[in-house]
From Swiss-Prot:
CDD domains: S1_EF-P_repeat_1, S1_EF-P_repeat_2
Task of the protein: Involved in peptide bond synthesis. Stimulates efficient translation and peptide-bond synthesis on native or reconstituted 70S ribosomes in vitro. Probably functions indirectly by altering the affinity of the ribosome for aminoacyl-tRNA, thus increasing their reactivity as acceptors for peptidyl transferase.
Name this polypeptide is given: Elongation factor P 2
A GO term for molecular function: translation elongation factor activity
Lineage of origin: Bacteria, Pseudomonadati, Pseudomonadota, Alphaproteobacteria, Hyphomicrobiales
C-alpha cells in the first residue's frame, strides 16, 4: 500500500478505508469559491459490492493499493459471469456482473479489455473508447430533414438506444462511445 494525496486518485484506483478495499468508480476534485477544496469519490467495496460516497480534503493522505492491470480478450458471458482470456498466458478470468456493470452491452467477442486485478480477483475493467455496432431500428428520414443537424432515435444491435443523424438507416454500422453510447461516426468497414 502507498499513501497518496486524495486529489491524485482516479477511476479504477483501489483504496484501503478502515481495513476494507474499495475500487473508485468516480473521482472529482471540487474547488468551492469559499472553503477547502475536496475530492468527491464514489466507490464500490471489493467483496460485497456495496457502493459508498466519500469526501476527502484534497491534501488528505489516502492508502492506495497496488493493482495489476493487464490486457485481456473478451470470450463469452454465461451464468458464472463474463469470461476473459490473457492473450500472453492464455489464462482465463471470470468477472462478475457487478464488476462489469454498465459495460456489459458493449462487450463484443474478441474485444481487447483492460482488466484490473487485486490479489488475483478482477475488480474493474476498462473498455476501448469506441465500439462498432449495427443499427437495427430507427425512424425513416423525412424529405427536407437532411439539412438540419437534428438527430433521430435508434436502437443498436446490442440493445442500447442512441441518437443518430438522419442519413443513418437500419442495417448501417456505426461507431459509438462505450462510456455513454453516443454516436461518433458511420463505420468505415
Amino acid at each position: 500500500m502507498v499513501k497518496v494525496i486524495a486529489s491524485s486518485l482516479r477511476k479504477g484506483n483501489v483504496v484501503d478505508k478502515d481495513g476494507k478495499l474499495y475500487v473508485i468508480l468516480f473521482a472529482e476534485n471540487i474547488h468551492p469559491g469559499k472553503g477547502t477544496p475536496v475530492t468527491q469519490l464514489d466507490m464500490r467495496r471489493i467483496g460485497d459490492g456495496v457502493k459508498v460516497s466519500e469526501r476527502y480534503r484534497t491534501t488528505e493522505q489516502v492508502e492506495r493499493a497496488y493493482v495489476e492491470e493487464r490486457e485481456h480478450t473478451f470470450l463469452y458471458a454465461d451464468g458464472e459471469g463474463f469470461h476473459f482470456m490473457n492473450p500472453e498466458t492464455y489464462d482465463q478470468v471470470a468477472v462478475s456482473e457487478a464488476v462489469v456493470g454498465d459495460a456489459a452491452p458493449y462487450l463484443q467477442e474478441g474485444m481487447p479489455v483492460q482488466v484490473s486485478q487485486f490479489n488475483g480477483i478482477a475488480i474493474s475493467l476498462v473498455l476501448p473508447q469506441r465500439a462498432t455496432f449495427e443499427v437495427v431500428e430507427t425512424e425513416p428520414t423525412t424529405k427536407g430533414q437532411t439539412a438540419s443537424s437534428s438527430y433521430k432515435p435508434a436502437v443498436l444491435s446490442n440493445g442500447v438506444r442512441t441518437a443518430v443523424p438522419p442519413h443513418i438507416a437500419p442495417g448501417t454500422r456505426v461507431v459509438v462511445m462505450t462510456a455513454d453510447g453516443s454516436y461518433v461516426e458511420r463505420a468505415k468497414d
